Amino acid sequence: MVREHTHRVVMVAFPDAQVLDVVGPLEVFSRTARLLESEGRTRRPAYAVEIVADEAGAVAMSSGVEVVAARAWRDVRGADTLLVAGGIGFEAQLQNESLLSWLRRQSSRVGRLGSICTGAL
């Protein structure tokens, strides 16, 4: 069977998230997409990965490493899988009512909603 649809995986990052929680799962999806393509099992990339945050741009992780969010999470449309990173910054996100409200709305719009570690807000 040859895949026709590119599955969009969106990771929500936030300040002081764990960098492995953000990039680790995205690496798995990205590597899987390359493998499926190399085996001729897809006509287009099987997975497209994207990092989003409160605002587009650099987000400092708990290690001090920065990841770059392509867009603000509120601008996400058409995600198939939505993941929320974990890390020591999750406690501040528990007070981010606009993010929590957006995640609740997304739960009925995405195929999968998941979290990594403490990202289960």
Predicted features along the sequence, with ranges:
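Extended, subdomain-level signal for the structured scaffold at the beginning of enzyme domains
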Residues: 1-113
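Glycine-rich nucleophile elbow surrounding the catalytic serine of serine-hydrolase chemistry
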Residues: 121
